[in-house]
């Protein structure tokens, strides 16, 4: 899924649904030691509010804008549900030579994500996300003119599916298989996946709204 992105980096938000609320970040987080950003500006940003900073008439706004020029800008996030009891979120800047850093670990993610900018927001979800592990949702190019969201039905971070049998013969008499044929094969496997999308003119979705969307 692709969507145009507009506005300042500090007004671009991402939120993933998690098993205990949500994980929310901005592409340029206005938490700075030098220059010091006014707490009320940073607090409004963390709540998902759009910031309309007037550097010409507000010194606090001018300081925040200057600080934003020296922040790391996060371009890509990946949530991977690699087992029935673990998911991770990692992020990186746009430079391909730089590594990912970890953002969060949890148990079971619902498979929902919300991305917002100054023009509105959109939410996407995948039904039975954690149950169908290893699954992943990746959001990239968040600092560019067009962002993309990819739902991976098989998370590329984990090992490839292995269809080899665990042994070179059957054990129908001594164990549970009931037949001697070695039948490990991908033939005949099928799965239906359901995805939902919601578009909004409003700013970033809060955690409760994203949960309602994911549960619907």
Question: What are these model-predicted stretches?
Answer:
Residues 1-216:
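Beta-strand/loop-rich accessory regions of lumenal/periplasmic or secreted enzymes
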């Amino acid at each position: 899924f692709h969507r145009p992105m507009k506005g300042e980096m500090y007004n671009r938000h991402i939120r993933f649904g998690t098993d205990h609320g949500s994980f929310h970040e901005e592409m340029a987080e206005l938490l700075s030691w030098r220059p010091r950003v006014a707490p009320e500006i940073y607090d409004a940003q963390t709540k998902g509010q759009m910031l309309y900073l007037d550097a010409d008439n507000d010194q606090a706004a001018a300081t925040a804008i200057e600080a934003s020029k020296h922040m790391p800008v996060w371009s890509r996030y990946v949530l991977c549900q690699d087992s029935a009891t673990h998911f991770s979120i990692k992020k990186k800047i746009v430079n391909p030579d730089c590594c990912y850093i970890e953002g969060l670990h949890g148990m079971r993610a619902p498979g929902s994500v919300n991305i917002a900018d100054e023009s509105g927001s959109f939410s996407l979800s995948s039904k039975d996300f954690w149950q169908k592990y290893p699954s992943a949702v990746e959001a990239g190019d968040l600092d560019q003119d067009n962002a993309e969201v990819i739902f991976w039905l098989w998370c590329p971070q984990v090992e490839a599916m292995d269809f080899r049998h665990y042994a070179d013969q059957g054990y129908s008499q001594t164990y549970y298989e009931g037949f001697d044929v070695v039948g490990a094969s991908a033939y005949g496997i099928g799965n239906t996946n359901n995805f939902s999308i919601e578009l909004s003119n409003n700013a970033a979705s809060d955690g409760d709204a994203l949960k309602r969307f994911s549960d619907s």
